[in-house]
A protein has these predicted regions:
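A charged, aromatic-enriched C-terminal amphipathic alpha-helix characteristic of glycosyltransferases
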Residues: 98-132
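A short acidic/histidine/glycine-rich donor-binding loop in glycosyltransferase catalytic cores
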Residues: 78-84, 96
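CheY-like receiver
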Residues: 30, 93-96, 131
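C-terminal "capping" alpha-helix adjacent to the active site of nucleotide-linked donor transferases
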Residues: 87-103
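Short beta->alpha linker loops
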Residues: 22, 85-88
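Short, hydrophobic/aromatic alpha-helical segments in well-folded domains
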Residues: 54, 93, 110-111
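Nucleotide-sugar donor-binding catalytic core of glycosyltransferases
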Residues: 1-78, 125
Length: 133
């Protein structure tokens, strides 16, 4: 992320940042106003192909981010989500979508549609209950 931070204005909150910790409403406002929202998993999550809750929060808010875990493909097809598999590719894709915000919308819409229709508590519990023997 450091190359992007050097080239673009950013609003970072959290430990060891100039802003420090932010409350939930402030965090939501930062995400809503961002051109791109980083979705960077811990190395262990990437290794296990996990997908942290930040992914879901960002897209639920109608924002966009490049994911760094192949675990995104467990939920979405390649035409529905943008995934980078190296730091260089992550920077390259992030910069592309910062400069081309209009290209984000199809991904946001596809992911939100699937969240509404498939990845919610109602769907999950119905699926669990239907499959209990």
């Amino acid at each position: 992320m450091f190359p992007l931070l050097e080239r673009y204005t950013s609003d970072l909150g959290g430990p060891n940042t100039q802003r420090g910790h932010v409350d939930d409403p402030t965090h939501k406002q930062i995400l809503v106003n961002a051109k791109i929202c980083p979705i960077i998993n811990a190395p262990s999550w990437r290794e296990e192909k996990g997908l942290m809750d930040r992914f879901w929060s960002i897209f639920t808010l109608g924002r966009f981010g490049v994911a760094d875990s192949l675990g995104a493909y467990d939920f979405y097809n390649e035409d529905e989500v943008v995934v980078a598999t190296s730091a260089e590719e992550y920077i390259e894709l992030s910069e592309y979508y910062i400069k081309n915000v209009d290209k984000q919308l199809p991904f946001i819409e596809k992911i939100q549609k699937r969240i509404r229709e498939e990845y919610n508590w109602y769907y999950t519990w119905r699926h669990i209950l239907e499959n209990i023997e």
